[in-house]
C-alpha cells in the first residue's frame, strides 16, 4: 500500500525539467516539473506516483488515462475540446481520458498531485 494523505510528509521528487521534457508545450511563464514513479515504470501499462509543477501554464495531450488527486496548491484545468475549466484545491480529484488536450494553469507557486496512469493497449488482432 502507498498512502497519500494531505497531512503527511512529502516525498522528495526527481527533477523532470520543463513541460517540453514530458511532451507538453509551455503557454505562459517558465514552469518546471518534477515527480517520482512509485508504482510500475514509464513503460508499464499502469503506473502511479507523485507529480509537481511550478507556477505557469502549459498544454498537454494525454497519452494515457489518468486519475489524480491534488495534494498541494491550486490549479485550473481546461479541457480544450469542451472549453470546460475547473479549479482544483487540495483533496480534489479528476479523471482525464487518453487523447484529451488540457491546459494546466498552476495558480499557486507550485502544485503536487498523486496520480494513477493507465496506458491503452492495442486490441488483439
Which residues does each predicted region cover?
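A short, N-terminal "cap"/entry segment at the start of jelly-roll beta-barrel domains
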Residues: 1-45
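Conserved short histidine dyad/triad with adjacent acidic residue
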Residues: 37-62, 97-98
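Short, conserved beta-strand element in jelly-roll/cupin
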Residues: 53, 62-77
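Tight coil/turn sites that cap or link beta-strands
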Residues: 56, 90-91, 99, 109
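Short acidic-glycine-tyrosine-enriched beta hairpin
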Residues: 82-98
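Short, exposed beta-strand-loop hairpins at the edges of beta-sheets
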Residues: 103-107
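A short hydrophobic beta-strand segment most commonly corresponding to one strand
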Residues: 108-124
